[in-house]
Amino acid sequence: MKRICFLPVVLLLTGLLCGCTGQQQNDPLPQEHNHAMEEGTETPKYDHLTVYSPLPESETLLYCSAFRKDTGITVDCIHLPAGEMTAQLEQERDNPQASVLLGGSADNYIQLREAGLLEAYQSPELTDVPEAYQDEQGVWNPIYIGTLCFACNTDWFARTGTPMPTCWDDLLSPALAGQIVMATPKSSGTSYTTLATLVQMRGEDKAWEYLQKLDQNVGLYTRSGVEPAERVKNGEYAVGIVFSHDAFRAALDGYPIEVRSPADGTGYEIGACALVRNAPERERENARIFIDWLTSSRGEECYIEAKSCRLPANSTARAADGLPPLDEVKLITYDLEWAGENRTRLISYFDTHIYSARTLS
């Protein structure tokens, strides 16, 4: 785990993108809170907050620094891939060390919600978020939208004359043997969304058959869902299966990356944040203030400064220039609840029959 403490010296499409005792573990705890996102709000007496996040450190540094400037609250952000973040919360169930989870796909939050690891809290800022992106049970809070895509290294495709992939089956081309990089769903929320997308598109039997074939072309499974875009932009691999914001970020930075959305349909994530159940009492108020800030237009417009290329969930937040509208992407009807409820089972099958089998071969 990497820990960064933000000290006193010194977050897309508009209209889309923790603790109490004495209750049952699977019964989320509703809380009332009416913190106003206004200047002059009195800083709580305890000015510290601990957060777990799978987002890149460069992003969380900016978000947490801006939050401290606005509120006077210092954030200690611990970086973990989504799967490892889940495992960490399980280990700390009786004594959580963090109060807020920042980022990662909502299907992961659904799994955590069902495991009784999250505290129910809904920011008042959600009045500006489309209902379709909100948690029906009122536990996690949506903050951005991201679609799955192929990040393609244009230099490699120009050099080899290989056609760029336009659909999922194109990734099975022999010309791409060893040239695909993706994360393992055991640790990465990005890769689990890929897995759940293929299962929902094709059915389980055909999805597993496809993934067995795809495995023959995968040169590397990474720990983090962000890393494949980094590997592709540096020319180590030809194609990365990533969320669009990670690919667009590299392209807008001038790297030889072209973003291809599968023409036969693709899944997406609703990026979320939430309170950790049974989190340190002294951080409870600060945690709610942070959730309110993250879901506000002020918080989500920090995506522009961070060059994260994330699509804000808050309809009043401005999105970065140059990002294609979601209506240009063929999205499947992605079932978040199903994905969350089946997460453990699908990851276990992938790990046993594809990833581990590969490592042992």
Question: Could you describe each region identified by the protein language model?
Answer:
Residues A151-W156, A196, I270-E283, C302-E305:
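A bilobed periplasmic-binding-protein/Venus flytrap-type ligand-binding module shared by bacterial periplasmic
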Residues D107-Q111, K233, A238-P256:
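A ligand-binding cleft/hinge motif common to bilobed small-molecule-binding domains
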Residues M1-H48, T359-S361:
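Short, low-complexity disordered leader/linker segments with a strong preference
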Residues T50-L61, P96-E236:
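Extracytoplasmic ligand-binding site segments that recognize negatively charged/polar headgroups
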Residues V276-Y334:
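Mature extracytoplasmic/periplasmic domains
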Residues G146, Y210-D215, Y221-T222, D253-R277:
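Periplasmic-binding protein-like
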Residues I332-S361:
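Conserved C-terminal helix/tail region of periplasmic/extracytoplasmic solute-binding proteins
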Residues G22, L29-Q111:
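Early extracytoplasmic/lumenal segment of secretory-pathway proteins
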